[in-house]
Amino acid sequence: DAILGEAAECRLAGLFLEPELTSNTKLLYVHGELDNYTLAKDCEEHVKRIKAKPGQVKIDIKEGWYHDWHAGFKPKKVRAQNLNKCPEIFVDNKGFVVGPMIDLVLNKYKVFPSMEAARKASEDEPVKTFKKMFGIFKKEKCIERGVTIGGKHIDEYMPQFMNFFKENLL
């Protein structure tokens, strides 16, 4: 098995808090050093938490690259929402959301009376529940606008992409 994450969101995507790779899986994260949309440093921290054999996990931070480095246009500023200052969201080994966001949901804003009620709402009305979570981000004033995206690195990146899968799947 082979997994290649490109400019992954490693704080808010609900990744496992204590991740573990199966013995036959290789994982490569590729990130732009200048990416201010999904931060490379968050993925560096995530990679350190992954239980794996030596050489099974690698992160490659590309110097001078931004988010969407293979877009085919020069880097430019866009008004996309940036959530880099928002509370982290992880999932424990039982599949439950954990992290600072839970304290905000249950204690500070009292969106749900209990963790069980929050889980049930997520199952029964996921869109409505997501909107409530996003509302917390607004109240926390952790949403900013403005990131830089773009780049013309596809020719430089494609051999790494292809070779990773050839080496690990064929």
Feature locations, PLM:
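C-terminal catalytic histidine-bearing segment of alpha/beta-hydrolase fold enzymes
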Residues: 55-170
